[in-house]
């Protein structure tokens, strides 16, 4: 590490959100450009900075600051320079000259220890003197806090967050219970808090540590799709995390229950432990679904006649099950329509829409992702929105919503129980993708009396987020469900659809016969498989399906295998978008982002600003939010502004600071999970050995059904057979079914 010191000459750039600052310091006539997260430095201050010199592509040598210390001015010249800089509001150059002329080298001590004496100077009242003193105290408090936090290895950007949250309480919090940070500060997890606790000297069997570990494991479980964990599984994972053998878990669970952080329920003699937020979500969703489940009397002949009119006008013929779906949508406040590809879901939904249009009803259509909404729009001929957009997402939690803020929930929907959606009918497609959190937000915005129609394929993979909403609703048996199973004649001509249903039913799929849309390319070994995929994606498929290379998609079950996402993305990046002197790049860990790269947003960020632009680059629409699964292309990497601009498929431009690039990953290849709700002209699926838990029928079925015109399976036939025959799936712990049944049991008991 190297050190530099000097006066802060000027602030060139500062990002007010994350504190990233570019500034010059001067010492002995030498000027040095420094960069780093230094939210609280000001022009005129004298600092000593620790870090290293780095070479910038445009600005040559810069000093990258990792930590710094402020040195109080200790002579008249230094004080004059500091006060003249504008660091203290209310003091300009002339006033600074008067103050220094009066107090000389003793100026700074007097300002800190005897601020009332500043009132001796013409133009400074006693209230102004106290204001100057308070500003100095605030700055001193901030600097002291930064130094204190850095002693425990806390980086400056995180230190900024901590100080903004706690102020001068940080000393007691860090020394007594640093695990509070994991509860209160977005971006601080248990492991960070645990590292701080270790430095502070908190014992490994501390009550704070054990309770924080329990809560951390429960929250981590939600990232695996669970809304709760069985007691034994929770205990095992907490012991593995803490590296201790905790004896009396019941005591800590009782404490966390009393603190309203968790809920413990017994199901089939098994103790189930929930983070309270997710228990409440499932309970709320159950209650709101129950409220929407109302029945309406309507004459069957009237319904049949209206369906017949629609059939005649549209030139279609519905089968009995499709007609039943329309009738149930008419007679019920809530209905679920499920079925695989080619079973007539789109025709059924379009008929329902036409039926309600004849009633003069206001209809809203939505899907979980931009791609899914686009598919729904194209299929139905009516505009569909993402659920987030329909609910009018805002980039922050409402004032006073400390629970959401503490939980790290940075999204807020303008449409809710106080401002419901203005619609008579709401249709939501791709329901298998909807997690419990989004379902909770959606239902809050649906008024009793509004019809809700949920559409999806229950055999697809469940949502990436926690819960198993569609499956749980259907399995409860408490709401009207229509399952479409017949494959219609036009769909029956597609081997994609025929084979998808065969896979789902466990029937044999013939791979060695000629097919126009379901191809199997036999290759052995990962490298041979990848070489065949290269030929397909660049030379064969674009013309065959009439699509751009970037519109095709490689889908793979895993991230880490020889044909996993990470390896394939590196290989395909070099193949499809090789390095070039005119293309700017940015390295993030092991990944290089390059102008022209295909990328994907991998987490929901409700505060990212976006804009749409005219053909001349003029902004025409603005908003916030980029969502998990959004795909686009890197348009520009600016080393000057230190940001990356991505153009997403729906025309949104989003600019990411370099510090935000962990929200993106290359998307030449993506996991099957990430492809949910999307449809591509052609998909390429490697058939090579991978983790057994991912080599199953559910994954294969979902991957195959993502293709619109062509499926290309490349690899070993025995892997295909293994996946098609493996019906085991990762257990997902969810209990929406239980909450629904509890509501119904209470109602039945009341009657």
Walk through the language-model features, giving the residues of each:
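Structural detector for short beta-strands of small beta-barrel domains
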Residues: 1-15, 51, 631-635
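Short aromatic-glycine-enriched beta-strand elements
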Residues: 14-25, 640-645
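Accessory alpha-helical DNA-binding modules that contact the DNA backbone or grooves
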Residues: 20-28, 33-34, 42-52, 57-271, ...
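Loop/turn positions that initiate beta-strands
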Residues: 44-46, 596, 629
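Pre-P-loop entry segment of helicase/translocase ATPase cores
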Residues: 150, 219-220, 264-324, 396-397
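ASCE P-loop NTPase helicase motor core
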Residues: 323-326, 331-513
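Conserved helicase motor core of P-loop NTPases
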Residues: 458-624, 743
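C-terminal accessory regions
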Residues: 505, 621-623, 628-751
